Amino acid sequence: MNRQAILRHIILTAIVSICTFISIRGQTKDSLSVKIEDGWIEKIDNKIGIDVSLNNSYEIFEVKTEDTKFILYPNTASNLRFNVNYKFISFGFQFTPDFIPGNGEENLKGNTKSFELRTAFIFKHWFTDLSYSKVKGYYLKNSADFTTLLKGDPYIQFPDLNYYGFAISTGYSSNSKFSFRSLTSQTERQLRSAGSFIPVINLRYYSIDDRSSGMSTQKTNNFESSIGPGYAYTFVSKEKFYLSLGLQSSLGYLNTKLTTRQPDGDITTNQDNYIFRWDGKVGLGYNGRSFYTGVYTNISGTEYRQENTTAINFETRVYYHLFLGIRLAAPDYLERKANKIEKLFQKQNASN
């Protein structure tokens, strides 16, 4: 049995086992430890949420000058993500298995390996999201602009092009009647329609490194910081069905260190650029006490002008995120530990 078949078997076995476990337990604990804040938010403190999702969130690079455009894509149509969520904390990882349709066309687009870790801490008002991701192997999506491609011909490939990055985002949800968790970790349920102003600060470091054996290769080290306002609103029907709309924009600074490796020595240059980002989100979902599901669509844009050149880097993309999750009873000791941490954070906020 090959690796893909073994992985499919493990995933299916886990899903079937969990669903069977849930069906046996039924609804016996649905009403336990239910906490409702002023009729707006229901806290699900006695259960752990486990979900699996598909998304097309991956790093691409698009550079456009007056007469040339380069669009580099990894050979990954969709990512598979697993998440565990409890109270204020969420942890997950994602990768790109070949058995998902659209992945694994290595003869045509080359081989890509990617992986991401992500964790989030979401309190009453404040939240922080941290992530680490890496990708190896890209292809030139617009190869036809540089050569004549016939059906079945491979794209121009960059198997030794590597990306890795760290990111942290911190924000504040101003409306206590709005549940940010209900849209992100699903550890709460929004019972009535509400919206909130959400400013966010973003910090990001990433590197793009061509590790091929060519005579001249390049590497960039990039640091980006930005800040901007946002707003989100959740329309709720029958306390379980919801439609969410959100808009976020940010203005920031991008510093790029470019190293060109040549046989007679490295050449290093630095650039400083202002960067503008915007993001719009639409979500539709079901958030019950035993399971939850939904689909989110994001439209995002990024633009900045390279220093001392006429080149403009821009990117406009559409993302999807389809998820399905269930809730299991949390161990008592986990609930006690989490309550201590949450109370400590609340005391520090109150003292400030």
Residue map of PLM features:
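Bacterial Sec-dependent N-terminal signal peptides
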Residues: 1-40, 241-243, 324-328, 350-352
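Outer-envelope beta-barrel architecture signal
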Residues: 44-50, 78, 87-89, 124-128, ...
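Residues on the lipid-exposed face of transmembrane beta-strands in outer-membrane beta-barrel proteins
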Residues: 52, 80-86, 117-123, 168-174, ...
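Transmembrane beta-strands of outer-membrane beta-barrel pores
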Residues: 54-60, 86-90, 95-101, 123-125, ...
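Surface-exposed strand-loop-strand hairpins of Gram-negative outer-membrane beta-barrel proteins
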Residues: 57-79, 90-110
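Extracellular loop and loop/strand-boundary signature of outer-membrane beta-barrel proteins
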Residues: 66-70, 101-105, 151-159, 185, ...
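Outer-membrane pore/translocation modules
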Residues: 116-221, 298, 352
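Outer-membrane beta-barrel "beta-signal"
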Residues: 166-170, 316-352
